[in-house]
Amino acid sequence: MLELFLCTLRRNELDVINLYNSLSGLMQITTGGNMLNFGYWDDKTKNPLQAQCTLSTMFGEFASLQTARTLIDIGSGYSAPALQWISEYNSLKILCMDINLQQLKNACAVKHQRTDHSIALVSLKRSKSNNIFHINATSTILPIKNNSADRVIAFESAQHFKPFFQFIQESYRVLERSGLVVIAMPVITKSSNSLSLPLFVKLGILSLTWASEHHKLEYVKSTVKTHGFQIKDIEYIGSNVYGPLANYYIENRQKLRSIIIREYPKFLETILYKSLLQMKAASHHGFIDYILLKAKKT
């Protein structure tokens, strides 16, 4: 646990990898799947995995994947969203790119049906999984030719790209003219010193999962606009992300706690619970939001 805390303070790429390798198992056993996003919750949502799949579908529609040909998914994790998208948009070719080699290897195993996955296997039966390619690379130096893709997406991963502006520069380079960069990420919405202890406390679980730069909304928008992109749309969905997730955990804590403490120390579950409460409060008071941003290369 000390190492996890140190990772949140140092916040370099290796720390982000170690952090996600440590916490992804926790997310998997509590959600029942390999999607590593917060999820989108509405009145019909019954559980975290359903919320995650809903957000993945929503993000694909927001990115206009029905008209896309070549998609670069940066920070793809276990590629669960990519497997979902390839089943929904069969003409799509997806390059899954991640600096985390361990997660890429697991994603390749899922792709070749060598391991079980509650979402992936359903998608694989209906899709051309050979249109998914896995590349071990950093987000700021993409091993991709100039003007070779029509979509670059970062699905709840751009908050870890350091420096963020270099990711935007690389996205501009590899995108065709009028190509889209599409981002889903948590942002800070109220002015505050992002490194201050009060904000660290207010962020709750985001202090762990948001292990890189804590970007303010205006910084994200200005960086995108000053590097050759025109922002086409922004959706603010934090009210359907943070609070409902925390409420689900509160309502089902006894069951989820029994699952977690089989594999993790009891104090970690306590930290998780208190962090979710802090995250809910931060969202309620307007300190944080969750955005979907779409911008076109000009």
Question: Language-model segments: which ranges?
Answer:
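A short acidic, Gly/Pro-enriched loop at the edge of an enzyme's catalytic core
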Residues: 140-152
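Class I SAM-dependent methyltransferase SAM/SAH-binding core
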Residues: 70-74, 78-141
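Substrate-binding/catalytic lobe of Class I Rossmann-like enzymes that use SAM or dcSAM, i.e.
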Residues: 205-287
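N-terminal auxiliary segments of SAM/dcSAM-dependent transferases
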Residues: 1-29
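A short glycine-rich, Lys/Arg-flanked "PGG" loop and its adjoining helix->strand segment in the class I
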Residues: 165-180
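Short, glycine-/aromatic-enriched active-site segment of Class I SAM-dependent methyltransferases
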Residues: 187-211
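Acidic carboxylate diad motif detector
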Residues: 183-185
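Class I SAM-dependent transferase core
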Residues: 18-62
